[in-house]
């Protein structure tokens, strides 16, 4: 009987299930979108019960599509939107409030209060993270302080906290197991990434009872088995990682200096730094890449707020293109950008500049500038921003980038990938299987149950669909980068400070 690995990929807008075979190929995919809840400006919530219902539903659907039985699943891997916070009553299994999503800014004011007390330095030293409303800690505190009766229940030991991975595992095991992995724990702003434990001092500062927190385990191990009510048989749950870390693993970035960029709405860059937690001087996050083989490995992470979103803007607001795919055709119809730069600082600019007062600009316009030049400049902006983050990573880590592995929607744009390679001066590799997030969770699960022997075997599965090699002269490259940096300085400090 042929065996497979099931991957549950619980994202920000949809719940998916992908089944993989031994070669790391996709056998079937099932997907369901779920409701986004916006109670106030800047607030974002999800319904944890809807997420669980949809996730269980797509698991059954993926089995049906693949025409395989639950007995053929050797293990289940979970990957999830990170930081999103669920608090539930362990006696009833019911959430006390909606899940507060990573994008939610409701605790920004409280973060400012902590910053005024000088706690940002303590938090960065212990957790590797910036003090920000993005992470789970202040979201948990908000629920305890604002939901009637929540604090009393928590003090009595009746409330549990979990990110989405923990919530799914708890439900899959019918409340038997309350667990998370090192990668998800490292995004809570409560976990000491050097001592590998929940930090007592941070829990005290935020007034969060330790009894709420899950046990932290490696990303690849058998956490428990699914309750028989789910599939009719018990299946080992054996892999767990946050989405960006899972993508790094799925891209087989197993050695220090290997990096991946996910070109989505924004871009997420992660570089493996091995067993060394590198402290960033350039506003990057230090995070846990994976917990496996009795040790943890670390990564530097940089996020670019506006990546593929600039293409959506060209399509929906400026109506310059009908589809995102058309941008490649227009960009290649002109020889160069004609001196035009587009800085997509629509919501400020992230790593390594960190200026929330920057705003979007188009610079270098002349009478000869055409629509094609603006479209090309928009695509080029993704490559320039990636260049800036990767240079910061190299500087922080002292590790030279060897090649960049890519995934996400915009990695299908050949013009962008070639330009990315030219600007970085390194090879850019696009894999055959672009479902790298789900694949990473599958690999973690499969390793724990012996479905794959070791990381070497997995590395052999990784196949290049297309490789892009740098072909631009250094002088031209330097001139373009210089122009980009000049454009960024013009975009900065634009919005009036209150």
Curated annotation (Swiss-Prot):
Cellular component terms, GO, for this chain's entry?
A: cytosol
According to the record, the protein's activity is controlled as follows: Activated by phosphorylation and inhibited by fructose 1,6-bisphosphate (FBP).
Pathway(s) where this gene product acts: Polyol metabolism; glycerol degradation via glycerol kinase pathway; sn-glycerol 3-phosphate from glycerol: step 1/1
Cystine links in this protein are none
Q: Name one GO biological process term.
A: glycerol-3-phosphate metabolic process
- Pfam short name (any one): FGGY_C
Supply the alphabetized keyword list.
ATP-binding, Glycerol metabolism, Kinase, Nucleotide-binding, Transferase
Q: Which residues bind sn-glycerol 3-phosphate?
A: 12, 82-83, 134, 243
Q: How does it assemble?
A: Homotetramer and homodimer (in equilibrium).
Protein name (record): Glycerol kinase
- What molecular function terms (GO) are annotated for this protein? ATP binding; glycerol kinase activity
* Catalytic reaction annotation: glycerol + ATP = sn-glycerol 3-phosphate + ADP + H(+)
Sum up the protein's function in the record's words.
Answer: Key enzyme in the regulation of glycerol uptake and metabolism. Catalyzes the phosphorylation of glycerol to yield sn-glycerol 3-phosphate.
Asked if the record carries the keyword Protein transport, the reply is: no
State the organism named in the record: Clostridium botulinum (strain Okra / Type B1)
């Amino acid at each position: 009987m042929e065996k497979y690995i099931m991957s549950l990929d619980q994202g920000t807008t949809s719940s998916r299930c992908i089944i993989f075979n031994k070669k790391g190929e996709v056998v079937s995919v099932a997907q369901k979108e779920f409701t986004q809840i916006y109670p106030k400006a800047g607030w974002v919530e999800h319904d944890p019960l809807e997420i669980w219902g949809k996730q269980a539903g797509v698991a059954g659907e993926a089995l049906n599509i693949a025409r395989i039985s639950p007995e053929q699943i050797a293990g289940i891997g979970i990957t999830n939107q990170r930081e999103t916070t669920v608090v539930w009553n362990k006696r009833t299994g019911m959430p006390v409030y909606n899940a507060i999503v990573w994008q939610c800014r409701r605790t920004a004011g409280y973060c400012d209060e902590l910053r005024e007390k000088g706690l940002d330095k303590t938090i960065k030293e212990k957790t590797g993270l910036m003090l920000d409303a993005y992470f789970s800690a202040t979201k948990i505190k908000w629920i305890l302080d604002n939901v009637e009766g929540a604090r009393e229940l928590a003090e009595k030991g009746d409330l549990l906290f979990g990110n989405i991975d923990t919530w799914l595992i708890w439900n899959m095991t019918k409340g038997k197991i309350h667990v998370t992995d090192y990668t998800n724990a490292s995004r809570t702003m409560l976990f000491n990434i050097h001592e590998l434990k929940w930090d007592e001092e941070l829990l005290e500062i935020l007034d969060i009872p330790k009894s709420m927190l899950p046990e932290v385990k490696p990303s690849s191990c058998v956490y428990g088995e699914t309750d028989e009510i789910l599939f009719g048989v018990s299946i080992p749950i054996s892999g767990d990682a946050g989405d960006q870390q899972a993508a790094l693993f799925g891209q087989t970035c197993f050695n220090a200096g290997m990096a991946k960029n996910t070109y989505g709405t924004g871009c997420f860059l992660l570089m493996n730094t091995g067993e060394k937690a590198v402290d960033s001087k350039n506003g990057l996050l230090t995070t846990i890449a994976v917990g496996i083989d009795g040790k943890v490995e670390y990564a530097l992470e940089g996020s670019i707020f506006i990546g593929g979103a600039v293409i959506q803007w060209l399509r929906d607001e400026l109506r310059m293109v009908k589809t995102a795919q058309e941008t490649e055709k227009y960009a290649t119809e002109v020889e160069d950008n004609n001196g035009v730069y587009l800085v997509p600082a629509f919501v400020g600019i992230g790593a390594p500049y960190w200026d929330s007062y920057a705003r979007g600009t188009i610079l270098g316009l002349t009478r000869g500038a055409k629509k094609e030049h603006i479209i090309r400049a928009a695509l080029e902006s993704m490559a320039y921003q990636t260049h800036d983050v990767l240079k910061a990573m190299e500087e922080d880590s002292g590790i030279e980038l060897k090649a960049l592995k890519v995934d996400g929607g915009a990695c299908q744009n050949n013009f962008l990938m070639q330009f990315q390679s030219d600007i970085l001066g390194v090879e850019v590799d696009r894999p055959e299987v672009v479902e790298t997030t789900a694949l990473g969770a599958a690999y973690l699960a499969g390793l724990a149950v012996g479905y794959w022997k070791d990381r070497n075997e997995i590395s052999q599965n990784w196949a290049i669909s297309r490789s892009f090699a740098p072909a631009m002269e250094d002088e031209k490259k330097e001139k373009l980068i210089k122009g980009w940096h000049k454009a960024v300085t013009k975009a900065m400090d634009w919005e009036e400070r209150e």
